[in-house]
Amino acid sequence: MILSEIANKLLEGTSKPAPRPAALVLEDGAVFRGTACGASGEVYGEICFNTSLEGYLEVITDPSYAGQIITMTYPQIGNYGVNPEDAQADAPALRGLVVRDMCATPSNWRSAQSLPDYLREHDVVAVEGVDTRALVRHVRDCGAQRAVLSTVDVDEASLLAKVRASEPLVGQNLAATVSCEKAYAVGAGDLPASHAFAVAPPATARHRVVAYDCGAKRSILQNLVRSGCELTVVPWDTPAADVLAMAPDGVFLSNGPGDPEAVEGTYSQVEKLLGQVPVFGICLGHQMIAKAAGAGIEKLKFGHRGGNHPVMNLLTGRVEITAQNHGFGLVFPSLGELVPELSGGFKGHEDDLRFWARAGIAPVVDNPRFGRIRLTHVNLNDGTAEGVAFLDIPAFSVQYHPEASPGPTDAHYLFTAFGRLMDSAVLTNGGAADAAATSGTPPCPSAAAGRTEVQSSLASGQSGAPAAPSLTLPDPWECASYLDIDIAADRLAGWTFGEQAATVAGASTKEQGFCGGADCLEGSAADELSGLRAACEQPQVLKGKMPATGSRQAGGED
């Protein structure tokens, strides 16, 4: 009798409710059927897929998925439940979720509730039992497209008519729907207690940073704080004049959803900020910087979404495994014509940017608005642009997610690079000493020496922007000096853990290796940096790579 009762309880705990039919219909007529495992309803969005093996809660709560129906390629989702510490926002922004098998009985000590319960609580329509392998292959071959997911109407003809009448993703300003409504501050006191084992922030913030919220993930803001930034997060369309009035040491542009062409309220302000203050962009922020520079943006066939995308850093030759989530990408040739003397002698652009990875060259273009821009990162799967760095103003950006969540942390060094960039850029009004007093960072000797003044044309007040102090940069100013960071060393030597933070936080910037000038370094590090700067003045050919020769070198014929 006792065994029978135990068996019944186990059965009750592992059984799923009676299945309700659900249907997913794509605009090209493809139909995939399954059973409901979330809230009831009918939703429309762009179908996409994510290849992450774990981190489903981070994916579901990522604001960048606004307007989309996500298909998870891993066969079982929900087996470790849901906990609020891992969520990237207060609530999911996605339209719907498609999985092969939904686990209703999670097993993990951190689990607060099951994923099906979480989805129902937040009115997220979800379906299981779908042949996700067939669905992903279809999206891969036919491209991302409009879709409808319904648990209330499963008639194929009816759903097909509805989805073809729905609004496409292109042209929608979804960033405005997930941005904050008013500015707020984020500091060390806002870090979650459950992450006490993680990287500890310095005792005193080194930099004041204004972050544009176009759908920012919590983990990005937390990583900025842990790297020594005191944040003021502002809405997506905050005027540049208001940002400059805060006198920040740097500006961060966050990730976000949807079509970057529709987020003019952000990139029009970024155009006024470039050249006035150091700028770092991630994902949509990368696209905002590109748009500000006049670049073209293309819609990818099915996007990059997952935690296993290989990207080569063209400055170092290292390959990083990255987390990505985007459906649009920068058209690098649209930034300007190549500068042959800084591009291995090549005069013509390549459609497949893996050409530069094979040649070991980080090409430079001459941008009409902001001068020279170097391609720094390339996707090794499809040859698309993954990162750029400006050579004449302090700004850089990447298309992927260095904070991961979920995914690998190979690119975490970029948060350190942002700190080094802010350390190296000094405001002319008041000089290096006043700038150091503002930021709490000792001035770099090389920054106080020879300088190249960089003044944006917008600083004079064009387009309604107020006059702003120009930036002076160490001469020569090279992106390699702050982007060439050893990944392993950054994970260990550059960071403090737990109680160590209080002791190490008081160390000087020089001791922690955040200064961008060669005079702030010692021994082999200074020699290495000098070598990097010398290399930047010559065609970029990395050791161990094929020489810069080919069918199109120096204007050669195909």
Regions found by a protein language model. Give the residues of each.
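RNA-binding accessory domains that recognize and position tRNA/RNA substrates
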Residues: 2-229, 233-241, 246, 260, ...
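Short solvent-exposed loop/turn micro-motifs enriched in small/polar/acidic residues
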Residues: 15-18, 304, 370-371, 380-381
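Residue-level detector of beta-strand face positions
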Residues: 23-24, 62, 310-312, 387
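Proline-centered loop/turn at the N-terminus of a beta-strand
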Residues: 125, 208, 278-280, 296, ...
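Active-site-proximal beta-strand elements of phosphoester/diester hydrolases
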Residues: 208-212, 322-323, 396-400
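Cysteine-nucleophile active-site neighborhood
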Residues: 245, 250, 254-335, 407-417, ...
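Catalytic beta-strand/loop cores that center a nucleophilic Ser/Cys/Thr
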Residues: 317-392, 475, 482-486
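Short linear motifs in low-complexity or flexible loops
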Residues: 501-509, 518, 525-526, 530, ...
